[in-house]
Amino acid sequence: MSSFRALAERNVPRYTSYPTAPHFSAAIGPGEYAQWLGALAPDARLSLYIHVPYCSDICLYCGCHTKAVHQRAPVDFYAERLSDEIARLAEIAAGRRVTHLHWGGGTPSILGAYWLRQIVQSLDASFDLSEIKEHAIEIDPRHISTELTQTLAEIGVNRASLGVQDFSPHVQRAIGRIQPFEKVAHAVGLLHEVGISNINIDLMYGLPHQSADDVDASAQLAALLSPQRIALFGYAHVPWLKANQKCIDEAVLPGVVVRLAQAQKAAETLAAFGYVAIGLDHFALPDDPLAVAAREGRLHRNFQGYTVDDAEALIGLGASAIGKLPQGFVQNAVDMAGYMRRIDGASLATTKGFATSVEDERRAMIIERLMCGLAVDLSELAGDYSAEMESLRPMIQDGLVEFDGSRLAITKRGRPFSRIVAAAFDAYLPANAARHSMAV
């Protein structure tokens, strides 16, 4: 157990991208982004991500780019800038087909019915939305109404993610997010009434005062609502990055051994309810597109987690939003003032990014295959990975990883340590390891 504990306590990225965001630099700006956009083929398929960095209040555990707002004016002002950014992008990449659209935050539904409609209308005027396969939005179940769900159905939303984290009252008090099971069930019902039947529920383990039984009970209650997908994320305690997390006493956070038990117990419960484990921390019903893609080897991973999205480019809209194009990554200004200033200055909002090399793309493929399918055939890829395999030797000896000379596979026992296996192929990690969260 001591070796497992040491592994679990390692600081490694979640690998929603490679290279990861801490390595982005100001060497990539609006000019490079405009060139990359202009190089997209006319028939390129796009995925759009819209970031709304506002919430009615900030939960203590939150690690998102967001801030509390209690007045309407800042939200309206921001929504106007989103519309301006869409128009700016359309000057370069108008008419491209959009296959996936995701609203994140923050709480994107805080925009309200008017702006949700207006922004979709702006997108429709700028891009081809006729082939959208998935139109998803993140929702705070504490703030949902019939007007909101009707608007979501009207603009074409077909998947909703509900942030729950834990149903236990004492854990909810500890994280500053009170939402009884009945409130979440009500939100699911409202979504079903308007035909939005693809529901995701997000849970967390590793929260303050949370036991393995708490996580297990929350998994059971979530499964009783029959969502198509359930995510079980490990809480990332990074108070050096997120000031709100400084309000959480580290003494009441579960240790590594308990975190492992929490994740394992919940996974067993979800399996008993018929959910299939997807990658590191997702679960889906067998007929859900995510489960089908996993079986067929078509699963991908991006900044929203596991996805079936295979678009050629991801376009990020809004403050802090990240995009991915064939040439590399771009990120908008993280701070609100910087984002507004750039948009008002008739510029793209890009402030940093990363131009990827052939070697970066090769390693990104290895990491994605490990994170998605828990296996990769290194013989299919050019390169010498003997040093990486040597670093994984202890995990092979412990039965967490198997290697037959070409195919590297993470065992069932090793699944919780998938990020560590992926990290062996991260050429940039040593310089910034301390900036990431624990592996489990």
Q: Where are the regions that the model predicts?
A:
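Flexible, acidic/Gly-rich N-terminal and inter-domain linker regions that tether
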Residues: 1-46
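C-terminal scaffold of the Radical SAM
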Residues: 38-42, 68-92, 96-383, 439
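Divalent metal-dependent hydrolysis catalytic cores, especially in the metallo-beta-lactamase
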Residues: 47, 60, 135
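Local cysteine-cluster metal-coordination motifs and their immediate loop/turn environment
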Residues: 50-66
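Short amphipathic alpha-helical interaction segments
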Residues: 382-397
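A short, conserved structural fragment
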Residues: 396-406
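Minor-groove-contacting beta-hairpin "wing" of winged helix-turn-helix DNA-binding domains
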Residues: 407-411
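Short, amphipathic alpha-helical interaction segments positioned at domain boundaries
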Residues: 413-440
